[in-house]
Amino acid sequence: MASSRTLGTFRLPPLPTIREIIKLFRLQAVKQLSQNFLLDLRLTDKIVRKAGNLTNAYVYEVGPGPGGITRSILNAGVAELLVVEKDSRFIPGLQMLSDAAPGKLRIVHGDVLTFKIERAFPESLKRQWEDDPPNVHIIGNLPFSVSTPLIIKWLENVSQRNGPFAYGRTRMMLTFQKEVAERLTATTGSKQRSRLSIMAQYLCDVQHILTIPGQAFVPKPEVDSGVVHFTPLTRPRIKQPFKLVEKVVQNAFQFRRKYCHRGLGMLFPEARRLESTGKLLELADVDPTLRPTQLTVSHFKSLCDVYRKMCDEDPHLFAYNFREELRQKSKKEDDKQSCRL
């Protein structure tokens, strides 16, 4: 583990370009892994500047690939940069960067979805949740294939104040498909408003910082990308367990073009669905004819608070899954058909 230290200005020595690194190590983007490389260091410098002042910061980079953003982070004067890369083909190129920046770059060959970050940096960096954010940052050009499950995982970590957020309100600067970036930051009533909008915005201040055109990447993806900045809130806008909030929000957006009562009704068994849905909406003071995209975070706070009380009254309610009820119903129908034959 690195020790806390004050560093002077640092610049990497002359190195092969990212394009030359790709050629030298015969690297090719794997389409199945949604890999796309940023080669323009002016653009990677811009992304890193948007993360804020990184002088003497401790940075966790996910999915560094051939190291474009990695170089820009190192040149920002960080105290230490920890990169986690799953694809072994990129390790030699990253090792070249490590050799050029002694003591500043740590490389972990592993999976960001399972890597334990909470013990990676000095204990002295930890801050109380109500204090200013710690000098720890997460930066990453995420492969599109893992971006949504990863941000949901980290949002759950925010709610539990563990993982990267064991240090405090760790800030994140992450690249997504533009459509995902727009969903994360969508306002009430927007056509992009979604489950991701609510889950991100009830826990964090979320800003769509930058759009990166597809032609900036090699190979060129079919869609543009968006850079999103997250700062965890000192107080979540919904004070209920993450899994409960997630369940309510997921069900609300089951039928995004229909009235909200349609999806919210799926929280309850069919035998009492109409009655329980009416009770939920009445006690939460939510208009049943609103579309899911028209629901505010405050609406979801009320819905989650009432649903929590209903779960407390009925210990079996939270475990209810309408898909399982449909499956059991379908199985019974199949059994009846078999008996008739």
UniProtKB/Swiss-Prot annotation:
Q: Name one GO biological process term.
A: transcription initiation at mitochondrial promoter
Question: Which CDD domains does this entry report, sorted A to Z?
Answer: AdoMet_MTases
Kindly report, in one word, the top-level EC class recorded for this enzyme.
transferase
Give the binding site residues for S-adenosyl-L-methionine. Answer: 38, 63, 85-86, 111-112, 141
- What SMART domains does this protein's entry cite? rADc
One short Pfam family name for this protein? RrnaAD
What cellular-component terms does GO give this entry? Answer: mitochondrial matrix
Which residues make up the transit peptide? 1-27
Q: Which UniProt keywords apply?
A: DNA-binding, Methyltransferase, Mitochondrion, RNA-binding, rRNA processing, S-adenosyl-L-methionine, Transcription, Transcription regulation, Transferase, Transit peptide
What reaction does this enzyme carry out catalytically? adenosine(N)/adenosine(N+1) in rRNA + 4 S-adenosyl-L-methionine = N(6)-dimethyladenosine(N)/N(6)-dimethyladenosine(N+1) in rRNA + 4 S-adenosyl-L-homocysteine + 4 H(+)
Compartments it resides in: Mitochondrion
E.C. code: 2.1.1.-
This entry's Gene Ontology molecular function terms read:
DNA binding; mitochondrial transcription factor activity; RNA binding; rRNA (adenine-N6,N6-)-dimethyltransferase activity; S-adenosyl-L-methionine binding
InterPro entries attached to this UniProt entry: KsgA/Erm (IPR001737), rRNA_Ade_diMease-like_C (IPR023165), rRNA_Ade_Mease_Trfase_CS (IPR020596), rRNA_Ade_methylase_Trfase_N (IPR020598), rRNA_adenine_dimethylase (IPR011530), SAM-dependent_MTases_sf (IPR029063)
Task: Briefly state the protein's biological role.
Answer: Mitochondrial methyltransferase which uses S-adenosyl methionine to dimethylate two highly conserved adjacent adenosine residues (A1583 and A1584) within the loop of helix 45 at the 3-prime end of 12S rRNA, thereby regulating the assembly or stability of the small subunit of the mitochondrial ribosome. Also required for basal transcription of mitochondrial DNA, probably via its interaction with POLRMT and TFAM. Stimulates transcription independently of the methyltransferase activity.
Family according to the record? Belongs to the class I-like SAM-binding methyltransferase superfamily. rRNA adenine N(6)-methyltransferase family. KsgA subfamily.
Q: Spell out the protein name for this chain.
A: Mitochondrial dimethyladenosine transferase 1
